[in-house]
Regions:
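Accessory RNA-recognition modules of RNA-modification enzymes
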Residues: 1-233
Length: 235
């Protein structure tokens, strides 16, 4: 059984305003309406409940959950999905506006393999991740690239993976649904020119029914075929 908030009678004093416009629809950051210190406290309580109360395990004193110095723009990898019809929020549906079948480049709605929320700004990965995603979508829409339909298994554009490293290197891998060399080259050449900070530009052709690409051979289109996530100290 699932539910959603209809109205607030009285908000908890612990409730915080989410900083992401997609919070509550995107499943990526489920606790953003709690201050970070409270998130850590609740997560420590979850560990205690699952091991001691549910698991009946005798435990010593549980140390508090360790927090991160960064709560935004800390991820080094994000995978985005193309869809020929973007997910409409409840507010958009209830508003009755004629939005049409706009495409999406973003994240899956939790529990739905064929529904994708169009993301305007994600707070998980540092620049230039957002700019690369938005420019990719703009170029594809303006140049008539077809977006993936997971049920009908149609559309050229399937996925895009962006990796950023503390070294400053950026890897972009675009997954296409067909080996359309002309359109592949046009998009990748555009990204290379628009984002010179991309040090590794790759693509994969995936004609399978699922999105896994681990069994497919990536093509290094420009730059290196790898990035280094960490500097190794000589000492």
């Amino acid at each position: 059984m699932e539910g959603f908030v209809v109205r607030y009678v009285k908000k908890s004093p612990l409730r915080a305003e989410a900083f992401c416009e997609h919070f509550g629809v995107c499943g990526g950051c489920k606790w953003q309406n709690l201050p970070y210190e409270e998130q850590l406290r609740f997560k420590t309580g979850q560990v205690r409940d699952q091991l001691a109360r549910i698991g009946k395990i005798a435990l010593p004193e549980i140390a508090p959950c360790l927090g991160s110095a960064r709560t935004q723009f800390y991820r080094n990898k994000l995978e985005f999905t193309f869809a020929d019809r973007r997910w409409l929020t409840r507010e958009e549906v209830e508003g009755g506006a004629d939005i049409g079948a706009a495409p999406a480049l973003g994240f899956h709605i939790p529990g739905m393999f064929d529904k994708v929320l169009d993301i305007r700004k994600c707070w998980l990965q540092p620049d230039p991740s957002n700019d690369i995603r938005m420019e990719t979508k703009r170029f594809c829409v303006e140049n008539g690239y077809t977006f993936h339909n997971a049920r009908e298994h149609t559309g050229l554009m399937r996925n895009m993976i962006v990796r950023t490293a503390s070294t400053g290197e950026v890897m972009v891998t675009v997954v296409f649904g067909a080996d359309d060399r002309e359109r592949i080259a046009a998009l990748l050449d555009h990204l290379a020119a628009a984002f010179p900070q991309i040090t590794s530009l790759c693509y994969v052709v995936n004609t399978k029914l699922n999105d896994s690409v681990g069994d497919l051979d990536p093509v290094c289109y420009k730059g290196k075929d790898h990035i280094c996530l960490l500097y190794t100290s000589p000492s």
